């Protein structure tokens, strides 16, 4: 009788060493650095909010949003910050809707929950008007209908959960009005 023995591809010492390095929430330790995500997000980090393993970012949009979507591991694309839409859906919206910007934060190694999360969306009123054909009805704002309009602009389904806060704001001293939505 002939027996075949299959040898493991790694030695017991290598397997033991791998066991000592716990897999993170969406990948191995340092996956943000290894995939180039830290470098991509670096120009968007908010001054005073880079606190080591936690850093806030703002103004992410367009090409960089598209690039971030391509760099995220498959598991991380479904991340939802406190019932916000999936990160991949928000990144696609920022890639598609002119002027739409995203805010959120990165959690860095050595934390096991290393990730990128998006908790805020800013949509210029011009994108809303292009979609609806009319400006914001401020007397009734924000209403559930406004959320449905925003969800439609973002390309979300009807099952998307509304933000915890939503308002119209003017920023950077310009006259541009923005729809601001935040999931806490």
Can you annotate each of these PLM segments?
Residues 1-136:
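Long, contiguous N-terminal structural blocks used for assembly/anchoring
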Residues 24, 42, 140, 171-176:
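Intrinsically disordered, low-complexity regions enriched in Ser/Pro/Gly/Gln/His and often acidic
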Residues 29, 47, 145, 176-181:
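Short, low-complexity intrinsically disordered segments
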Residues 133-156:
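Short amphipathic alpha-helices in soluble, non-transmembrane regions
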Residues 149-184:
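Acidic, proline/glycine-rich low-complexity IDRs
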